[in-house]
Curated annotation (Swiss-Prot):
Its cofactor is heme b. InterPro entries: COX15/CtaA_fam, HemeA_Synthase_type2. The chain crosses the membrane at residues 13-33, 96-116, 130-150, 165-185, 197-217, 258-278, 290-310, 311-331. One of its GO terms (cellular component) is plasma membrane. Pathway: Porphyrin-containing compound metabolism; heme A biosynthesis; heme A from heme O: step 1/1. The gene is ctaA. The keyword ATP-binding does not apply. This is Heme A synthase. The keyword Metal-binding applies. It comes from Caulobacter sp. (strain K31).
Length: 343
C-alpha cells in the first residue's frame, strides 16, 4: 500500500486542474471545427482584451467584414461572400478565441487564490506557474499562426498550425499529469519497471502522431487519396516528393498523409502488443492494467474513425470527432504513463 503525505496532495487543486483540462479539450475540438470550416482567418486583428466582445451593431459587423475582404482568402476563395455567410465563419473563430480567454481566466484566478491560501502542494507550484506562462505563449503562437494567412496565403501555414496544436496538446498533457499528482499525492517510492519507459515512449508517439495530423489538416491532405489501404491504388503516392526536404515533410499532401498513416499503423500494433503484455504481466497493478486495456480500445476506435473520416473526404462531423479522439487518446496515454510510475 502506497503511503502519501497529506500536505503533498490537494483534491480542490486537482478538481480545478481537471476543469482546466476539459476547457483545453473543448478549445482543441472547436479549433478543429474552425480549421475544417476555413474560419480561422475571419478575424484579422488580434485584440486580447477588446476582442472578447463580438460585433454589437450592423456597422461593427460591416467593419469586420471589410477587413476580411482585404486578405487573399476572400479575394481568391470567397469572393462574393455575403455578410451573413461571413458571420458563419466569424463565430467559429470567435468561439475558439473566447475559449482561449476562458482557459486563461479559469486558470489564473484560482491559481492566485490557491497560492494565497497555500493550498497548492509546494512541488506543484512551479508547474502551475509554467502552465500559466505557456498559456500566455499559446495566445501569441495562435496569432503568429493566423498572421501567416493574412498577406500571401489563403490559409495558415501548416507548420504554424502544427506548432499551435502541438503547444495546446502539450498543455493538455501537462495539466492532466499535474492534476493527477495533485489528486493522489507523491508516493514515497516510484515503481521502476520496463513499463515506465514504454508508456512514456508511447505517449510521445501519440503526441507526434497528433503533429502529423496537424500537417494533414494544414495541407488539406485528407481531401486527396481517399481510398484505403492503398493511396490512389499505390502503396506510396506518386506525388510524394515536394519541393526539397522540408517541402516534402511539411507541404506535400501525399507525404504528410502517408506519414500519418504509417504512424497510425505503428501505434495500432504497439497498442495491441502492449494490451497482450499487460494481460500477462504479474507486476503491473490492476488499475494500470485496466488503463492499458482502455488505451487499446481508444487506439482501435481512433484508427477506425480515421479511416472512416478519410474515405468520406473529411465531413465536418467526422473531422471534429477525429480531432476529439486524438485528444482523448492523448489523455488516456498520459494517464497510463502516470499510473505505471506508481507501485
Amino acid at each position: 500500500m502506497t503511503s502519501f503525505l497529506r500536505s503533498d496532495r490537494s483534491r480542490p487543486v486537482a478538481l480545478w486542474l481537471f476543469v482546466v483540462a476539459v476547457l483545453v479539450f473543448a478549445m482543441v475540438v472547436v479549433g478543429g471545427a474552425t480549421r475544417l470550416t476555413d474560419s480561422g482567418l475571419s478575424i484579422t486583428q488580434w485584440k486580447p482584451i477588446m476582442g472578447a466582445l463580438p460585433p454589437m451593431s450592423d456597422e461593427a459587423w460591416r467593419a469586420n467584414f471589410e477587413l476580411y475582404k482585404k486578405i487573399p482568402q476572400y479575394r481568391l476563395v470567397n469572393a462574393g461572400m455575403t455578410l451573413e455567410a461571413y458571420k458563419g465563419i466569424f463565430w467559429w473563430e470567435w468561439a475558439h478565441r473566447l475559449l482561449g480567454r476562458l482557459v486563461g481566466v479559469v486558470f489564473a484566478i484560482p491559481f492566485v487564490f490557491f497560492l494565497i491560501r497555500r493550498m497548492i502542494p509546494r512541488r506543484l507550484i512551479w508547474r502551475c506557474a509554467v502552465l500559466l506562462g505557456l498559456g500566455g505563449l499559446q495566445g501569441v503562437v495562435g496569432w503568429w499562426m493566423v498572421s501567416s494567412g493574412l498577406s500571401e496565403r489563403v490559409s495558415v501555414a501548416p507548420e504554424r498550425l502544427m506548432t499551435h496544436l502541438g503547444l495546446a496538446l502539450a498543455l493538455f498533457v501537462f495539466v492532466i499529469w499535474t492534476a493527477l499528482d495533485a489528486w493522489a499525492g507523491s508516493p514515497r517510492v516510484e515503481e521502476r519497471t520496463n513499463w515506465r519507459g514504454w508508456a512514456l515512449a508511447f505517449l510521445g508517439a501519440v503526441f507526434f502522431q497528433s503533429l502529423l495530423g496537424a500537417l494533414v489538416a494544414g495541407n488539406d491532405a485528407g481531401l486527396v487519396y481517399n481510398d484505403w489501404p492503398l493511396m490512389n491504388g499505390a502503396l506510396v503516392p506518386a506525388e510524394y516528393a515536394g519541393h526539397g526536404f522540408w517541402g516534402t515533410l511539411a507541404h506535400s499532401q501525399g507525404a504528410v498523409q502517408l506519414h500519418h498513416r504509417l504512424m497510425a499503423y505503428a501505434l495500432f500494433v504497439a497498442a495491441i502488443v502492449a494490451g497482450v503484455a499487460a494481460a500477462r504481466s504479474r507486476r503491473l497493478p490492476e488499475e494500470a492494467k485496466l488503463t492499458a486495456f482502455v488505451l487499446v480500445g481508444v487506439v482501435c476506435l481512433q484508427a477506425g474513425l480515421g479511416i472512416w473520416t478519410l474515405m468520406t473526404a473529411v465531413p465536418l462531423a467526422l473531422g471534429v470527432l477525429h480531432q476529439a479522439g486524438a485528444a482523448i487518446l492523448l489523455a488516456t496515454a498520459t494517464t497510463f504513463a502516470w499510473r505505471v510510475r506508481r507501485p
